[in-house]
Amino acid sequence: MRVEIVAADSLGVRSIATFVEACGYSIGVDLGASIAPRRFSLPPHPRELRRLEQALDRARRRLEESNIAIITHYHYDHYLRDEPELYAGRLLLAKDINRSINRSQRFRGYRFLVKSGLVERGRVEYADSRVFRLEGGLTIEFSKPVWHGEEGTKLGKVLMVRITCEGVSIVFASDVQGPGNNEALEELLKWSKPRPLVLIISGPPLYLGGYRVGMSSVELGIRNLEVLAERLRPKRLVVDHHLVRDPRFPEVLERLRGRAAGAGVEVLTAAEYMGLRPEPLETMRRELWKGEEG
């Protein structure tokens, strides 16, 4: 099984796009990317804009190579919203647009899947709480819809995914933010056997703590990452996305590494997983613009 993180916040864009090769299949998970229109009262730096185009190009290439595409929810950094035609001709496992979904995501999903004609032209399966067993021994399991972070958030719900091939599994928990609620944690802990090769998860949004998200939820997300390290025990725990938007993210990861080491779990950002130095350009936006002034 091969796992490539195509784009992520530690790679310079808002994303957690992932590409998996397993049991003869190529699977694109949440292949999309975006950037914050304003951060620190500043627009995106040209370097961010270039990185976004590069990330979207990689996402398109990986989607074209995929037999299977997965969309865990309909936030714009998780799918190629303006290019539904790229999803035709492959199996698309997507969040149900008719249940356990907020108004915004329902509208986006309807526009993308139904209004575009993709449902009629493509092979679309709503994946909530379902298990797909394919020829060659590939199994793709989906959680029930869980909160996008703290319980009751207006951001709605997302799906988590486990991909298993020949007794080897990976788990993908996009936008659960730690998770920032215990229901999502319990769902993840059900997937402890076989021990995951890698868990790719969005960390808590420290940059929004006490502002748009309660600090109690952020702290719960950090604690739940520690629980996952000790009880789910993935061989590699990739924590990225929302967490990396705060310059304090290395401190959180260092604390997590201290707890995870005893369980034999390696903690990494997406960039580190890919053998690269983290470049969270959104977090660096002030410095990037100051460099222009100099």
From Swiss-Prot:
Q: Which InterPro entries match?
A: RibonucZ/Hydroxyglut_hydro (IPR036866), UPF0173_UPF0282_UlaG_hydrolase (IPR050114), UPF0282_hydrls (IPR014426)
Annotated membrane-spanning segments are: none
Give the superkingdom in one word: Archaea
Read off the SUPFAM superfamilies from this record.
Answer: Metallo-hydrolase/oxidoreductase
Which HAMAP family does this one have? UPF0282 (MF_01406)
Family the entry assigns: Belongs to the UPF0282 family.
Name the UniProt record assigns to this protein: UPF0282 protein APE_0500.1
Q: Which organism is it from?
A: Aeropyrum pernix (strain ATCC 700893 / DSM 11879 / JCM 9820 / NBRC 100138 / K1)
Q: What is the lineage of its organism?
A: Archaea, Thermoproteota, Thermoprotei, Desulfurococcales, Desulfurococcaceae
